[in-house]
Amino acid sequence: MLSSIAKLSSMESFELYIFSFGFATFDICSLVARAVVIMEFLLGSFLVFNLLHRFTKWITAAFLAIFSIFLLWRLIKGDTESCHCMGDVVDMNPTQSLIKNAVLAIMLAVSWKTDRCVFLRQNLIAFHIAAVTMVTVFLICPPDFYYRNTSESNDLSQEAFRPVADSLDLSEGRRIICFYSATCEHCRHCASKMAGIIRRHDIPLDSVSVLFMQTHVAQDSVVTAFYTEHGDGLVLPYHDLHPFDFIPLTNGSMPLVTLFKDGTFVKEYDYLSLDEKELASFFND
């Protein structure tokens, strides 16, 4: 239960971690992340109240085995970074998470034959707990595609940006132009999300540019750290703009991801409305 709550409190990081493996679209990874949180909370709740004890313990054992195999695979790959088993609340690497799983497995084995339940109508109680858990998770943390379907970003000042694009040679061909600040938390998440999309769909790096609002005198070192820590090491071409030049372009909103074709504005996204399918098809049409 604690693990699920920790993941829910840092859902953005958890879904980006799943997306980083590139096995599915970000939307699917968002659903997988929430499914994991829901399952962990339900299994924890059922174990605490000893509901559906036989089924719950077998499923819990299967989950521990699957996650442990995954952690062993990450260790073999040389991964020493956080596996997000406890979200961002407790930073645990694969080795530490394996130890945690071993302790949980021992606790599960000790309690295996405990089958006494003080509740009648276990199935009904379990159903209500499951329903409330699912609704709560999606209410507290809706997937990004919910916002994509309910809002549209229109923050870029195209008139103000046109001379900037011309001066930076960004007015030819099909281009993705991102507007970030290296100190903005949502920009960091957006950079990780964009890195996953670019790699998954082989989007040409020379067709993607980033405009950073300058926040430091030594901006180059700040941007390098930004790409290393939050862009999965994917270094994109970038330019720095003084805040007095940057803010009028986006009306102070960031991050923004925009599409241009030969200098003509096509589409704009904020972090939540970012559409992986549209970004990929933009270069394939």
Regions found by a protein language model. Name each.
Residues M1-S9, S30-F70:
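Functionalized membrane-embedded alpha-helices
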Residues A191-M213:
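Conserved helix-turn-beta segment immediately C-terminal to the redox Cys motif
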Residues A102-I129:
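Cytosolic-side transmembrane helix boundary signature
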Residues T228-L256:
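Short, internal strand/loop/helix patches
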